[in-house]
């Protein structure tokens, strides 16, 4: 299935949590949209409120609400069903990435990685910043929770990876060496043991979340050309495959065990920026691109 979303391009997509019957898209035309992917492929709702291109998007665990960040420097909390904006916050900087806390009881907590090197922790109940994590030396590109939400990992233009205890604004572990490149996208494996990072030297590197966050040198996934784009990386729900788009519009699947390319295909006319596995069906993947389309693969 191919959905033509926006002439300006699609920055990110997210499946509706736990069910995957709908896809939420973040457009470069400033609009968020929700699509019926199991049936008609129709746009069910358009969410208007941002003034510039969207940067990131994240659902709450139950799907009733979602968060958007935009180049207009605003972060918004939306009601998925009614389309109403529940709350808007701004720090005066662009939030490059937004992540809701994974715990069902802490959905009011949001982390936003910013263009000014800071990670801000918002509480939607208070409508304000409750904590600042300020140790990166460049813009923050990704935030990934691990260890059941007790820790999170951030990547930055400063080419480092930092591990934090949630709620404590001091880096617990700092990972950097001269051979490392910037890693603008990351994903946690389904078993929670591994973090995969999209590195800008055209490879996906893997770190353990358990053993002092060491790099697993045996696990490197290559063959794609990300060309400086923050192409999303993801694991299949069973953990057997890793997927990523690339700068040429291709979509790659690697075998987790062997690290070999399992399959690659031409998915889009421009960069395949987003790629999401269906939460229930192993064989289904959705991709989005700056060519303005969302595609649903089986």
Indicate where each model-derived feature is located:
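Conserved strand-to-loop turn within each blade of WD40 beta-propeller repeats
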Residues: 26-29, 69-72, 113-116, 155-158, ...
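WD40-repeat beta-propellers
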Residues: 13, 32-36, 75-79, 98, ...
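Structural hallmark of WD40 beta-propellers
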Residues: 20-24, 34, 44-45, 63-67, ...
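Blade-level signature of beta-propeller repeat domains, shared across WD40, Kelch, NHL, RCC1
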Residues: 276-298
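A short beta-strand motif characteristic of beta-propeller blades
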Residues: 42-46, 84-88, 128-133, 170-176, ...
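Loop/turn segments within WD40 beta-propeller blades
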Residues: 13-20, 58-63, 99-107, 144-150, ...
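WD40/WD-repeat beta-propeller blade N-cap
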Residues: 4-10, 48-54, 89-95, 134-140, ...
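WD40/WD-repeat beta-propeller blade-loop signature
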Residues: 9, 19, 43, 53, ...
